[in-house]
Amino acid sequence: MESAKSRFLRYVTYYTTSDEFTGTSPSTERQKDLGRALMQELEALKLEDVHMDDCGNVLATLPASEGVDAPVIALIAHMDTAPDASGENVKPRLVRYEGGELKLNDTVSLTEALCPGLENHVGEELIVTDGTTLLGADDKA
C-alpha cells in the first residue's frame, strides 16, 4: 500500500489553483482532476457510495465493521489552492530542518516568525515547495 507521504507528494502536484472570477464551484474544472483521482483511491480502498457532486465535492462511506454499532465519521477537506502564487508545476522537496531560516530558493525563505511552530520541527524531515509555487499542503493533506 502506498504511504501517506507518497500520496501527499503526488497530491500536491495536481494543479488546483482557484479562480475567484469564474463564479462557479469549483472555480476551475481542473480541481475535479484531483477529485477523480481521490475517487479512484477510495474505490480501491473498498469504500462505498463513492461519488463527486456537481460542486466537485467527493463523498464516500466507510461503514462500521460488521457487528459494530458506530457512528459515521466525515472527513472534509477542500482541494483548491489559493491564487496568491502559482499552483502549477509544483515541485515538492524533502528537507531536514536544522532550525533557523529555511531557504526555499535564492529569494524565498521560511522563518520561525513567518511560520510559528516551525521551531518545533528541528531535526525532522519537512515537505516544502521550491519557493516558486504554493505547495497546497493545507488543502491536499
Residue ranges and their predicted role:
Residues 23-76, 80, 93-95:
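A non-catalytic alpha/beta surface segment that caps or lines the substrate-entry region
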Residues 18-24, 60, 85, 89, ...:
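Generic marker of "main functional regions" within proteins
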Residues 1-3, 61-62:
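Short amphipathic alpha-helices and their capping/turn segments at secondary-structure boundaries
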Residues 69-141:
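Active-site metal-coordination/substrate-binding segment of hydrolases
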Residues 2-29, 127-129:
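N-terminal capping segment at the start of a domain
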Residues 12, 16-19, 42, 46, ...:
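Structural signal for hydrophobic packing residues in well-ordered secondary-structure cores
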